[in-house]
Amino acid sequence: MRSKFKDEHPFEKRRAEAERIRKKYDDRVPVICEKVEKSDIPVIDKKKYLVPADLTVGQFVYVIRKRIKLSSERAIFIFVDDVLPPTAALMSSIYEEHKDEDGFLYVTYSGENTFGDLEQYRLE
């Protein structure tokens, strides 16, 4: 999925901002969070997050769920490079493994597991 944030901000500006953020807040990671285009889940009110390095993916999902005011019975999935990251993984390790060349970690979210293929688990 193409990032709207990337489309709206030139690479050099994004890289400079990520560098500035990392220097000023070395215990946090800069994250861009955007909704998967075709998902019927609510749009988030802000895209940029400064996430504590020791936050888990599960805790980050909770933050996103609260920001979009998603009811508890609705599912939410977050993706990094089109893959569901482990819920217990630290955001700092996800950042180190998947950060973009501009210095931001790009995360998308959806109400559906849009990239998972459940056919592979089908019982014959």
Curated annotation (Swiss-Prot):
Lipidation (Phosphatidylethanolamine amidated glycine): G116
GO molecular function terms noted in the UniProt entry: phosphatidylethanolamine binding
PTM: The C-terminal 8 residues are removed to expose Gly-116 at the C-terminus. The C-terminal Gly is then amidated with phosphatidylethanolamine by an activating system similar to that for ubiquitin.
Any one Gene Ontology cellular component term annotated for this protein: cytoplasmic vesicle
Main location: membrane
Site feature location: Cleavage: G116, D117
UniProt keyword Hydrolase, yes or no: no
Location relative to the cell: Cytoplasmic vesicle, Autophagosome membrane; Vacuole membrane
Propeptide residues, chain positions: 117-124
Pfam families: ATG8
InterPro entries registered for this protein in UniProt: Atg8-like, Ubiquitin-like_domsf
GO biological process: autophagosome assembly; autophagosome maturation; cellular response to nitrogen starvation; mitophagy; protein transport
Keyword list, A-Z: Autophagy, Cytoplasmic vesicle, Lipoprotein, Membrane, Protein transport, Transport, Ubl conjugation pathway, Vacuole
Domain of life: Eukaryota
Name recorded for this polypeptide: Autophagy-related protein 8
Species this chain originates from: Yarrowia lipolytica (strain CLIB 122 / E 150)
